[in-house]
Every structure is written in structure tokens, then in C-alpha cells.
Amino acid sequence: MEITGEKLQEKINKGEKVIVELYATWCGPCKILKPIFERVANTNTTEVQMYTMDVDANKEIAASLGIRSVPTIKSFNMGKPVDTKVGLLQESQINDLVNNLVNG
């Protein structure tokens, strides 16, 4: 599910468990990662909320999150960043991020 920077910041500030894939439409690895990330998000039955966000459409929040390259996946819990992964990830690695956030 696509999210805006403003909505993402609201969810982080509320202390929700959030994982966001930050991507750009011109990025080749992002195009490969997006369906993998969405598959994990669609099968996710935990309290973790998963979103995608276009960094070019949300430059201010991307900058505030320290995004320097895409794709980047960031996870948050209790208003704080928990993990950051840069580059193309496998489905199992994304599942590990979800599990770490649930059990962490």
C-alpha cells in the first residue's frame, strides 16, 4: 500500500510497528523489489503495517529519514527506527524484518 510522507510520519509518531519500502520509479532494483515486498505485505498477518513510498514524491520525509539510495527498507517501532536495509532483498529477508519487529 502506497503512503505519503505525512501519513508515514503520523504512523511513526503514534508508535506503530511500520515497515516502509522507499523507492523511485526510475530505479531498476526497485521495480524488482516492489512485487516481492507487496507479496510479503499481502500475506502479513501480524500487527506490522507495511507500506511503499516514492522518494521523489516525498523528498522532505525521505531526506529526514536519511535516504541516500534506493531501494531502502526501514522499520520503525515505538516512534524509533529499528532497522534499515539498502538494496535488493529476498523475500525471506523481508519476512525476517517483519519477524524481528514482531518479536523485538
Predicted features by range, described:
Residues 1-17:
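A short beta-strand-turn-helix
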Residues 2-4, 22, 34-41, 45-60:
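Thiol-based oxidoreductase modules, predominantly thioredoxin-like and allied folds used
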Residues 9, 58-61, 92:
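Short loop/turn elements that flank and shape the SAM/SAH-binding pocket of Class I
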Residues 16, 23-26, 69:
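Short pre-active-site segment immediately N-terminal to redox-active cysteine/selenocysteine motifs
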Residues 21-23, 75:
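Structural cue for short, hydrophobic secondary-structure segments
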Residues 27-30, 73:
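The canonical Cys-X-X-Cys-His
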Residues 59, 65-74:
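Structural micro-motif
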Residues 75-104:
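Non-catalytic, surface beta->alpha helical segment in thiol-disulfide oxidoreductase systems
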